[in-house]
Swiss-Prot record:
Residues 1-16 form the signal peptide. Keywords: Secreted, Signal. GO terms for biological process: epithelial cell proliferation involved in renal tubule morphogenesis; phosphatidylinositol 3-kinase/protein kinase B signal transduction; response to wounding. This is Uncharacterized protein C1orf54. The keyword Metal-binding does not apply. Transmembrane segments: none annotated. InterPro entries: DUF4634 (IPR027957). It comes from the Eukaryota. One of its GO terms (cellular component) is extracellular region. It is found in: Secreted. It holds the Pfam family DUF4634.
Length: 131
């Protein structure tokens, strides 16, 4: 019990000692004061400009229209032979519409089954394993 009593009083004295060879710092050297300034801009001098350039949208629409453009022939009448005295019955051709050919993604998605592709990949892997 006496040891505990001595320890309780001795620890604050040991920790709180000041050493004579220690240099003392002045208060102005001890505290480092840093000032931070925040600059808030004033937007009163600027006028708001909310104009939108629609030329990008127009060119995109034009490109989309060209992609989906359907060429139509005007309905014409064609005579298969040179003109005779008696005019034969003319042949009437209806307009032909064409659409762009499907790209590679459409062709791949129209495959019936991926099983042959998977089997061939599996055979290649097994062959590489046994080599």
């Amino acid at each position: 019990m006496d040891v505990l009593f001595v320890a309780i009083f001795a620890v604050p004295l040991i920790l709180g000692q000041e050493y004579e060879d220690e240099e003392r710092l002045g208060e102005d050297e001890y505290y480092q004061v840093v000032y931070y300034y925040t600059v808030t801009p004033s937007y009163d001098d600027f006028s708001a400009d909310f104009t939108i350039d629609y030329s990008i949208f127009e060119s995109e629409d034009r490109l989309n229209r060209l992609d989906k453009d359907i060429t139509e022939a005007i309905e014409t009448t064609i005579s298969l032979e040179t003109a005779r005295a008696d005019h034969p019955k003319p042949v009437t051709v209806k307009p032909v519409t064409t659409e762009p050919s499907p790209d590679l993604n459409d062709a791949v998605s129209s495959l019936r089954s991926p099983i042959p592709l998977l089997l061939s990949c599996a055979f290649v892997q097994v062959g590489m394993y046994f080599m």
